[in-house]
Amino acid sequence: VSQVVQAAGLAKGTFYIYFKTKEELFLELMSGALSEFFQELNQSLSQKEIDLEGYVDLFVRKFHKDHMLIKLGALMAGVLEQNTEEEAVKKFKMNLVCQLTNAAKLLHERFPVIDEKQAARMILRSYSVLLGVAQLIPSTPIQSRLLEDPALEVLALDFAEESKAILRALWASALLLSPGCG
């Protein structure tokens, strides 16, 4: 909090007028990052020529492993929602539901075999995959150096490559196994 108020040129007391805890600030940052993501996703889905490959590429590109949605998403349930007023968490979740619903509607229009409820679940599943893959990617210089050892080479993963492979399989199976696919 001290660094934030100093960078903003505010007094610490002013911060607490707007946010009761630092977690509420992080929740607000997460909300803003999600809004930005959904805006870009919805714009892309509005382009009728986007196919499954293009959708997966967009999703992974937007969630680069250093992106705020990955960093804050990993803290969501365990940290951010623990020290936050219930009303702030509810506001965040209601906003998320609204954005998910809008994106799911566009996904259903683009891929009609997936109903809107399933489309919303698939977005959440896709995000879960990216959070999981990001946890396996080295995040410190020491971890990165260790993976240069040929004996540890099998552990060296590329975020985009691994994420795309998993999401392609996930989405292809959803499209193939949807009730509308006879």
Q: What residue spans do the PLM features occupy?
A:
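Helix-turn-helix
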Residues: V1-E24, E28
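Hydrophobic alpha-helical connector segments
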Residues: E28, N42-L69, N95, M122-S126
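A contiguous binding-surface segment within folded domains or other stable secondary-structure elements
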Residues: A74, G78-H108
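Membrane-interface starts of transmembrane alpha-helices
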Residues: F111, D115-I123
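C-terminal peripheral helix-coil segments that are non-catalytic and often amphipathic
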Residues: C98-V113, V129-G182
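Amphipathic alpha-helical segments used for helix-helix packing
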Residues: K65-E87, P138-L146
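N-terminal hydrophobic signal/anchor transmembrane helix of membrane proteins
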Residues: F37, I50-K71, A156-C181
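Alpha-helical structural segments
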Residues: A7, E24-S44, C98, N102
